[in-house]
Amino acid sequence: MSRRTKAIAAIAGAASIAIIATGCSPSSDSGEEGGKVELSLATFNDFGYTDELLQEYMDENPNVTIVHNRAATSNDARANYFQKLGKEGLADIEAVEVDWFTEAMQYSDLLAEVPADAKGRWLDWKEAAATDGDGRLVGFGTDIGPQGVCYRSDLFAAAGLPTDRAEVAALLEGDWDNFFNVADQYKAATGKPFIDSANSVLQGLVNQLETAYEEPDGTIVATENPDIEDAYNTVVERAVPISAYAGQWSDDWFASMANGEFAAMLCPGWMHGVISGNAPEVTGWDVADVFPGGGGNWGGSYLTVPANGKNVDEALKLADWLTAPEQQVKAFVNAGTFPSQSDAYEDEGLTAFTNEYFNNAPTGEIGVKRAEAVTVATYKGAQFFQFHDALQNAVTRVFDGVEDQTTSWNTWVTEVSAF
């Protein structure tokens, strides 16, 4: 493994959420007349699996038809997954977000094993997280989410801030206090929020902790971890006042990318496609090679194949193909989903890629540098998703004026103590 790969291998995963909602259709029987197979693929957000990319596979495998369904949110995908896992109704291939992947690994016996010849494809930590106690690899790694800062250069200019991406990186370089100070400066100059959402800051802070809500041995430390309380207080006191929304993924939030409600976002690669897809006519978006506090990773998922599916063998072949380095580089070009495959980091399709939408920013190179900046792999236990979702709700209550800072924290403590 190269020095670069080792540096990137320190990254931990985090989340994604979706744009298009469709239902999950059941798999068709592989024994249909003529050997035709309909494979259902269930994802969320934008994995970069465009119709054109999926058509490549269908052209190479004319007996296969792929039906791609995307859940409305990661929460919806999770609820559907655990409601139906081991029963009926899941897609042939199901995407799982890293924030609840450890939870899924509790049921690894219900998932088909990744073919032996695919092993060793991924960053060490990515593959290890998908390997169960019996040594079975049951998840095909898709992407990771090293974060930079996406910003509107036109809105920065209006506030008297620099607009060149190198100058913006220098402006925002440093700790979170510096980031919030720049945000306060922007708000004072414009009267508008600087960043899209308070809970994106919570995500960024938590993803820089080694331990969040659970210890690796399963010990629950959520309400007793001073780092979590500090993160909550920081978000409520510094991020809420400079944020346009409490959270992300609402209709208004999607629309806000085009209407200038805010000037910046904490931005993993997969967010690039979300921004360009929701603000296609806006010309001011750019990407800076910087992140508060040094480095951060938000994003990353796996493809899993339910072992009781009707087309397990064919589903494994498709999942294998989709997560090969060549296809993940194409997915990155399509949607900014940064590959988790080691060989991809030597591919010029990644390293030399520039994104025309983001003022021709070298987002491939930025992604590699942002990945190298990550030094902490946050442990995310089986209940990470539930604890974190509840803490986001606590921030939202303060943002909406439903509860004050102390009351909302105490509400969270009471709520999660019952988990």
Give a label for each model feature.
Residues S2-F101, K119, T163, K310, ...:
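Conserved N-terminal structural module of periplasmic/extracytoplasmic solute-binding proteins
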Residues D59, D132-V201, E214-Y245, A307-D313, ...:
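Helix-loop-helix "hinge/cap" segment bordering the ligand-binding cleft or interdomain interface
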Residues R78-L90, L155-F156, N178-Q185, R238, ...:
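Short helices/loops that flank or line small-molecule/ion binding pockets
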Residues V240, G277-S340:
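Extracytoplasmic/periplasmic substrate-recognition and gating elements
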